[in-house]
């Protein structure tokens, strides 16, 4: 178990907005030295010290659910307060302004949009399975202690396209297309792949997030 500066265990709050199974994320945090806490209210987000926004599903239903639970402004406030924040899969997409997958506006925390992977004769969509990361920002704390080209597990048909390419922390190649696999901007980290399903490499990344939440 990883402890904070005051020697208390590190609690990682996982936002439940009814978009995906949270069990594997919780187990990943447990195995990475943190204490997972599932939260679903504005007040809980306000009290949280570190946050994960996971998600499996589609862009529009996710944004509608965040609105229904009145979580949009609390998430924005938490990020502006510099709380450690990790988005996973759909949780990465929602940080941006819009998506080709729907008509709802995203959180708009990062400038850019979400695009669909283009069809090619030799690839399948969704991009599903193990693939190697290209670490475009090797200084990103998530990669601390990892090899140069780690293998991680993907399941997605869409990818984020930031207006500022400097926020891209890793990319992945599917067919002839190189797409965003992770972003890092100030206290915001987000990954397209599933670290909780990426064996020891993914657990190492989650451990790095828990460690970052101590600071």
From Swiss-Prot:
Pfam families: GATase
Domain Glutamine amidotransferase type-1, first and last residues per copy: 11-215
Molecular function terms from GO: glutaminase activity; imidazoleglycerol-phosphate synthase activity; lyase activity
One GO term describing the cellular component: cyanelle
GO-annotated biological processes: L-histidine biosynthetic process
Biochemical pathway: Amino-acid biosynthesis; L-histidine biosynthesis; L-histidine from 5-phospho-alpha-D-ribose 1-diphosphate: step 5/9
Documented EC number(s): 4.3.2.10, 3.5.1.2
Keyword tags: Amino-acid biosynthesis, Cyanelle, Glutamine amidotransferase, Histidine biosynthesis, Hydrolase, Lyase, Plastid
Recorded superkingdom: Eukaryota
Active site feature: 89, 194, 196
Catalytic activity: 5-[(5-phospho-1-deoxy-D-ribulos-1-ylimino)methylamino]-1-(5-phospho-beta-D-ribosyl)imidazole-4-carboxamide + L-glutamine = D-erythro-1-(imidazol-4-yl)glycerol 3-phosphate + 5-amino-1-(5-phospho-beta-D-ribosyl)imidazole-4-carboxamide + L-glutamate + H(+); L-glutamine + H2O = L-glutamate + NH4(+)
Subcellular localization(s) per the UniProt record: Plastid, Cyanelle
Function: IGPS catalyzes the conversion of PRFAR and glutamine to IGP, AICAR and glutamate. The HisH subunit catalyzes the hydrolysis of glutamine to glutamate and ammonia as part of the synthesis of IGP and AICAR. The resulting ammonia molecule is channeled to the active site of HisF.
Complexes and interactors: Heterodimer of hisH and hisF.
Record's protein name: Imidazole glycerol phosphate synthase subunit hisH
């Amino acid at each position: 178990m990883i402890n904070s500066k005051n020697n208390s265990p590190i609690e990682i709050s996982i936002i439940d907005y009814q978009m995906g199974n949270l069990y594997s994320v919780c187990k990943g945090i447990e195995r990475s030295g943190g204490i997972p806490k599932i939260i679903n209210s504005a007040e809980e987000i306000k009290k949280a010290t570190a946050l994960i926004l996971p998600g499996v599903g589609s862009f529009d239903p996710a944004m509608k659910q965040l609105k229904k639970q009145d979580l949009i402004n609390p998430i924005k406030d938490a990020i502006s307060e510099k709380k450690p924040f990790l988005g996973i899969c759909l949780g990465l997409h929602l940080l941006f302004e819009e998506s080709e997958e729907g008509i709802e506006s995203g959180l708009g925390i990062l400038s850019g949009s979400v695009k669909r992977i283009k069809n090619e004769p030799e690839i399948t969509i969704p991009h599903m399975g193990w693939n190697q990361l290209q670490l475009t920002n090797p200084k990103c704390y998530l990669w601390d202690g990892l090899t140069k080209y780690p293998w991680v597990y993907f399941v997605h048909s869409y990818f984020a396209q930031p207006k500022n390419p400097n926020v891209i922390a890793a990319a992945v190649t599917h067919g002839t297309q190189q797409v965003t696999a992770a972003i890092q901007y100030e206290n915001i980290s987000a990954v397209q792949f599933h670290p909780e399903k990426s064996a020891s490499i993914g657990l190492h990344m989650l451990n790095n997030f828990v460690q970052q939440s101590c600071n």
